[in-house]
Amino acid sequence: MTLRETVNNAHSHWMDADGPESEIIISSRVRVARNLAGIPFPHLLNKENSEKVIHAVRLAISNKEASELLGGLELSSLGELSPLERQILVDKHLISPDLLNDFQRKAVVLREDEVVSIMVNEEDHLRIQCILPGLQLKEAWDVVNRVDDGLEKTLDYAFSEKVGYLTSCPTNVGTGMRASVMIHLPGLKLAKQLAGVLNAINKLGLTVRGLYGEGTEALGDLFQISNQITLGQSEEEIINNLISIARQILAQEQAARRNLYKDRREVIEDRVFRAFGALKYARILSSEEAMRLFSDLRLGVEMKIISGIPVRLLNELMVKIRPAFITKMAGRELTPYQRDIFRAGLIRREFANLPV
């Protein structure tokens, strides 16, 4: 898939819902931060050095000796994309919102299957990312590690024998790794246990963020849980620790769902079928309301209360209902009210042929 096809298509591999534990853990992501030796960190980069970094990355991904490790990678300057297309890459979790700032000096590298993306000149010179469906942190790390090794055949990284990889933010020094899972926790929220679980997570040295990272809301009861510390731990230790905690949260969410269904079956079923009815027939829907309804419906699908609704479709719709993709589909700028009408119509059309 070319970059142009990527921004015209809401689907991405992590949405396939075919990974382990994907009924609750939507996706796993591993990202490493790397900087080039002898070049100032991005917050000090001038235009000349920004272009130097982009040129170095372009050469690295073209290195035929590293082709088996890298796979097919394509680099594009963010300046080549429209504001809508840049935002769609954010909505698909392929780049961060921060990459959009001062975008003329930045670039993105994508693998054809969208499993791998590399942000160039974000907070660090390179941020190499792999995102996979379900709980697949080890597999995502294997992919990132191979790409990192391939790039290092050409690039000279800023590295200290004493502390490890050097990064713009001190919290990333060491392995430079951030591992995270996107997890759906409506059961804990309905059982009023969510705050306690999130507080416990923070005490374990992990951080909890919203759907699109730091400073964003947990739309649709979706949370990103990631490690905070990279110094003094190996990559394997970071991965194994997060897997262990993710499984504990998974078990708590499953228990909350079982208890809710046992004690408040009619209430849960009512939420699920009300959500389905609203999504199938509503004429006006804001993105926030749609995400809330998707959460209730997703809960019903995962608990086998309702059938015939692919989770993959719900994952895709999380991107399709965002303002950027709606504007792109409409082919013109819309007012917020017009977007809400368009969004409701889009969802009705998607639901019209479901065997429900």
Curated annotation (Swiss-Prot):
Coiled coil: none
Enzyme Commission designation: 2.7.14.1
Domain Phosphagen kinase C-terminal: start-end pairs: 24-256
Pfam families xref list: ATP-gua_Ptrans
Listed PROSITE patterns: PHOSPHAGEN_KINASE (PS00112), PHOSPHAGEN_KINASE_C (PS51510)
Keyword Kinase in record: yes
One Gene Ontology term of the molecular function aspect: protein kinase activity
Gene Ontology cellular component annotations, sorted alphabetically: extracellular space
Record GO biological process: phosphocreatine biosynthetic process
Catalytic reactions of this protein: L-arginyl-[protein] + ATP = N(omega)-phospho-L-arginyl-[protein] + ADP + H(+)
Sites where the protein binds ATP: 27-31, 93, 127, 178-182, 209-214
Activity regulation as described: Appears to be allosterically activated by the binding of pArg-containing polypeptides to the pArg-binding pocket localized in the C-terminal domain of McsB.
Keyword tags: Allosteric enzyme, ATP-binding, Kinase, Nucleotide-binding, Transferase
Gene3D superfamilies tied to this protein: Glutamine synthetase/guanido kinase, catalytic domain (3.30.590.10)
InterPro entries: Arg_Kinase (IPR023660), ATP-guanido_PTrfase (IPR000749), ATP-guanido_PTrfase_AS (IPR022415), ATP-guanido_PTrfase_cat (IPR022414), Gln_synth/guanido_kin_cat_dom (IPR014746)
Chain ranges for the short sequence motif RDXXRA motif of the pArg binding pocket involved in allosteric regulation as given in the UniProt record: 339-344
SUPFAM superfamilies: Glutamine synthetase/guanido kinase (SSF55931)
HAMAP family, A to Z: Prot_Arg_kinase (MF_00602)
Chain's role: Catalyzes the specific phosphorylation of arginine residues in proteins.
UniProt family annotation: Belongs to the ATP:guanido phosphotransferase family.
Name of the molecule in the record: Protein-arginine kinase
Gene name of the encoded protein: mcsB
